[in-house]
């Protein structure tokens, strides 16, 4: 059976696992209808528009 010859260092193990530890930050862009910051590719929470079309009717 194969056995590792040397103990892997902390930096090597942590470098390998670092891809799973990255935080995903949502991307924001300005809404084309109201100018509010909204998450990309999502309906604007303030006005209910996405790509110049109204998808939600919000009572303001």
UniProtKB/Swiss-Prot annotation:
Transmembrane segments: none
BP GO terms, sorted: translation
Annotated keywords: Ribonucleoprotein, Ribosomal protein
UniProt cross-references to Pfam families, sorted A to Z: Ribosomal_L32p
GO molecular function terms attached to this record: structural constituent of ribosome
GO CC terms of this entry: large ribosomal subunit
HAMAP family cross-referenced by the UniProt entry: Ribosomal_bL32
Full protein name: Large ribosomal subunit protein bL32
Underlying gene: rpmF
